[in-house]
From Swiss-Prot:
PROSITE patterns: PROTEIN_KINASE_ATP, PROTEIN_KINASE_DOM, PROTEIN_KINASE_ST. GO terms for molecular function: ATP binding; protein serine kinase activity; protein serine/threonine kinase activity. Its EC number is 2.7.11.1. The active site is at D219. This is Serine/threonine-protein kinase PKZ1. Gene3D superfamilies: Phosphorylase Kinase, domain 1 (3.30.200.20), Transferase(Phosphotransferase) domain 1 (1.10.510.10). May regulate an early stage of the zoospore pathway. It comes from the Eukaryota.
Length: 399
């Protein structure tokens, strides 16, 4: 996975004002990423009047069949760009590296005309014998293009551009300036319940959108949920947006390298992270939309307590975690849960049900009482203060 560093959380206005100055001080010029506009018309996918469901079926078929591996990485990358919606090609200036991963780096990019700042993942395609990155790269491009063809979702990272230049592939997505949800939890601790609910609602909405169109993320975890805005005061739940390019959403689901249709006999190397896999995947390789809901239950547990539901101290061996996932119920019997509402615990319990057929779907999660309390009721009821602190009389039973 490509992890964005904390520098990505800088306000875009500061980035824009300082980038050219930094480069001039270094005596460097920004790299020009010119990509000549080409016609990649797909009459079946781009035809006017194509229904979202037709696009979904087409996209799911492309994902399930997969794109043929070529001995030349360039040819393979070009093939990966063919399915899906037509994207407008632009020139991007590349600046400082803001992240790195197993298969490439992420650099800050700026659109030459609009000034939009984006995250540019750069994947070298120089070694045709190293095929490890290609399937994940193909899945990510196909999934992001399918989401875009379906109209996109405010809580799913948006694909801005994808092109090949030289022997490198450039994948341009919107920049989530607040960094990873994981980093926020590490830096600031567990979330206030109301803010955790906001994140959970957006993620459930994003997954509902994907699942309706036959797409399963297969790697939902705090590292793959990006914050749209910089944290100002985590304890009070205050976030700052600094620019007109800021998204109206709080979070963005990212990293679609494992995404695809539901699958059976799934190769565990092609999906998710072991700590977030549900029992049915570990037992039989069955990976459906229910897998995403299990993982989201783990994420919500972590947001509210700061601990993983099956690895409370973060020190357990994978085999121990796997045993607990398969056989032990989720528990809330430590102090971090003392002030968390019963509704929140009930929702998590229904997401971490062992039987995938009984697990809440994304739509059912959105209808859960914890998700639908009004702001006033939630503020009064999700964390119940002592009657004395609330200035309320305490009834005293006669002796």
């Amino acid at each position: 996975m490509l992890r964005l560093g904390r520098s990505a959380a800088s306000e875009v206005s500061s980035i824009r004002n300082s980038l050219q100055l930094q480069l001039e001080q270094r005596g460097a010029r920004p790299m020009q990423c010119a990509y000549q506009t080409q016609s990649h018309s797909n009459p079946e996918g781009a035809k006017r009047g194509r229904s979202p469901m037709s696009l979904a079926v087409m996209g799911a078929a492309a994902l399930s069949v997969g794109l043929e591996l070529q001995t030349d990485g360039i040819a393979q990358a070009r093939a990966a760009m063919e399915p899906g919606t037509q994207l407008q090609r632009h020139k991007w200036q590349l600046f400082d590296q803001i992240g790195a991963g197993a298969f490439g780096v992420v650099r800050l990019g700026m659109h030459e005309e609009s000034g939009e700042v984006a995250a540019v993942k750069i994947v070298p395609l120089e070694n045709p014998n190293d095929q490890r990155s290609y399937p994940a790269l193909e899945r990510e491009i196909a999934a992001l293009k399918l989401v875009k063809a379906l109209g996109g979702h405010n809580s799913i990272v948006d694909l801005r551009d994808v092109y090949v230049e030289g022997r490198k592939l450039f994948l341009v997505t919107e920049l989530a300036r607040g960094g990873e949800l994981f980093e926020q939890i590490v830096a600031y601790g567990s979330f206030p319940e109301l803010k955790a609910r906001d994140v959970a609602r957006e993620m459930a909405s994003a997954l509902s959108f994907m699942h309706r169109h036959g797409l399963v993320h297969k790697d939902v975890k705090p590292e793959n949920i990006l914050m749209s805005a910089r944290v100002v005061d985590h304890n009070s739940g205050v976030y700052r947006k600094s620019n007109r390019h800021e998204s109206s959403s709080l979070v963005k689901l990212a990293d679609f390298g494992s995404a695809g249709p539901a699958s059976v006999n799934t190769n565990l190397e092609d999906i998710g992270t072991a700590a977030y896999l549900p029992p049915e995947v570990l037992n039989s390789g069955l990976c459906t939309s229910a897998c995403d809901m299990w993982a989201l239950g783990c994420v919500l547990y972590i947001m509210l307590s700061g601990s993983h539901p099956y690895d409370l101290d973060g020190m357990s061996a994978d085999s121990v975690v796997e045993h607990r996932v398969k056989s032990e119920p989720v528990t809330f019997d430590f102090s971090a849960w003392d002030n968390v509402s019963p509704h929140a615990k009930d929702l998590i319990s229904k997401l971490l049900v062992k039987d995938p057929t009984l697990r809440l779907t994304a739509d059912q999660m959105l209808q859960h009482p914890w998700m639908n309390a009004s702001a006033e009721a939630a503020a009064a009821g999700l964390r119940r203060p002592s009657p004395l602190l609330a200035g309320q009389p305490i009834p005293i039973s006669p002796a």
